Curated annotation (Swiss-Prot):
Its main location: cytoplasm. This is Aspartate--tRNA(Asp/Asn) ligase. Its EC number is 6.1.1.23. The record marks H30, G81 as: Important for tRNA non-discrimination. Keywords: Aminoacyl-tRNA synthetase, ATP-binding, Cytoplasm, Ligase, Nucleotide-binding, Protein biosynthesis. HAMAP family: Asp_tRNA_synth_type1 (MF_00044). InterPro entries: Aa-tRNA-synt_II (IPR004364), aa-tRNA-synth_II (IPR006195), aa-tRNA-synth_II/BPL/LPL (IPR045864), Asp-tRNA-ligase_1 (IPR004524), Asp-tRNA-ligase_1_N (IPR047089), Asp/Asn-tRNA-synth_IIb (IPR002312), AspRS_core (IPR047090), GAD-like_sf (IPR004115). It comes from the Bacteria. Aspartyl-tRNA synthetase with relaxed tRNA specificity since it is able to aspartylate not only its cognate tRNA(Asp) but also tRNA(Asn). Reaction proceeds in two steps: L-aspartate is first activated by ATP to form Asp-AMP and then transferred to the acceptor end of tRNA(Asp/Asn). GO terms for molecular function: aspartate-tRNA ligase activity; aspartate-tRNA(Asn) ligase activity; ATP binding; nucleic acid binding. It is an enzyme of class 6 (ligase). It comes from Hahella chejuensis (strain KCTC 2396). GO terms for cellular component: cytoplasm. GO terms for biological process: aspartyl-tRNA aminoacylation.
Amino acid sequence: MRSHYCGEVNESLVDQEVTLCGWVHRRRDHGGVIFLDLRDRDGIAQVVYDPDTNEVFQLAEQIRDEFVVKVTGRVRLRPEGKANTDMSTGMVEVLGKQLEILSTAKTPPFQLDEFVQVGEDVRLRYRYMDLRRPEMLNKLRFRSKVTSYIRNFLDGNGFMDVETPILTRATPEGARDYLVPSRTHEGSFFALPQSPQLFKQLLMMSGVDRYYQIAKCFRDEDLRADRQPEFTQVDIETSFLNENEIMSITERLVRDMFRDLLEVELPEFPRMPFSEAMNRYGSDKPDLRIPLELVDVGDLLTNVSFNVFSGPANDPKSRVAALRLPKGGELLSRKQIDDYTKFVGIYGAKGLPYIKVNEKAKGLDGLQSPIVKHIADAIDPLLERVGAEDGDIIFFGTDKTRVVNEALGALRVKLGHDLNLLEKQWAPLWVVDFPMFEEDGEGGWTAIHHPFTAPSCAVEMLESDPENALSRAYDMVLNGTELGGGSVRIHDSDMQETVLRILGIGQDEAREKFGFLLDALKFGCPPHGGLAFGLDRLVMLMTGAQSIREVIAFPKTQSAMCMMTQAPGKVDPKQLRELNIRLRKTEQPE
């Protein structure tokens, strides 16, 4: 139907006849001449119709925005002074000789070049229109390049692309499962996989050795800007490699991809223990572009009369930390400080104590804060420890350790972005030495990653001191976003049963949920491990998108709904009867 894409029309085609197909991006009448900006996925070409072509000109007068047309004409240079250097096709135009309307269009719900003023709900409702925008098509094209690059890299390194089941059974992986009722097995349900975790481990036990899959995964959880109920994961697993070797391969993949697709040379990824990341940055995925750090000051405040500080300072499960913002005392207004106080409240902080350092040499008189008089004896060593200078402001977090880390960690990131403190464009790292377990709040333990992560200690220590046991897990972080997480897996059945027992999963429950895995571990299991990338997050970062919804063709909203198809929706009662499902009305509170 066509000889060229619109974006291919350039000076090399001058005096040649071309046939183009696409959407009318814009139609203009200038002095009796009709101009059509014709758009396809590769670009926009200007087509000109003059009155000399009577029938064709009359047809061109009927054209409106978003009509789908086929045009044939001769390529010529634009008149002097009319070139558009902002377009790759801007030096030429097509003098139209033929025109065929392939499809008409209603008035669009929004102009494609005015999308900034259009609400996201409207864009998602008419996603097929939204995706016509060059910005959106370019993101999809780039995503395709990323997946192609990943496949080529892994194929070239001996990995085998293997598909794993979508209909499987529910396993405890941290989030709620999407359940699928079975028609043929009454009262039983499949679960959509949160990850291919167990199947890829079974593939290692099957001798596949190196596996990968670009897999759809599903989690029924509360959504944020970087979460979707269904998402795409680059899943990787290897046999007979330790964590350093796995990290080396996957780091090389990311660095090569950034170099070849973005012309960005990422540095070697530094490695940081989990405990250091939490202490210095309040996060297990720190954004190292921001030159602000948390500093422990609790040991300086154990004897002050101010219980807001001394209480947590004397509690082993609490923390008092300081966050110094250089020149922040000069930069921030009282209203801004109040706004940041409200912000940390989102994370459970009861307030945001601060000290403004006006003139350090004047001692207490050079400080501005309602708390200074309560901690006067500790002021000098405190200022020295945080490196305070004139003009600074020092914020404090004083609460349970988790609250302090989350509140000051989030404040650190917000200050970095609000005040444009980012020192570099890209800051990758590995976070390593994660704890195996964390308290579940009910006297038990839950796995930091998942129950199949190998510990870095023997079974005896794991059983005697689970609180201090470390895992052989590792997370790849870029600009404060977790790109991927992985670990060396347990390949010994006794160790696996021990971990499940510590997690409160008894022998009967373990057999019922994981019997197939426990059996497989007893038939010769190689040491193995792997990593999974979030493809959506990776493409979001590489394209500079604000949300993963911008790099997914048909995403869900934050309420897990498709605005275009109105999914999820009601189903025919007959289908429910076939599945032996009866809906119960939820009782409304009086």
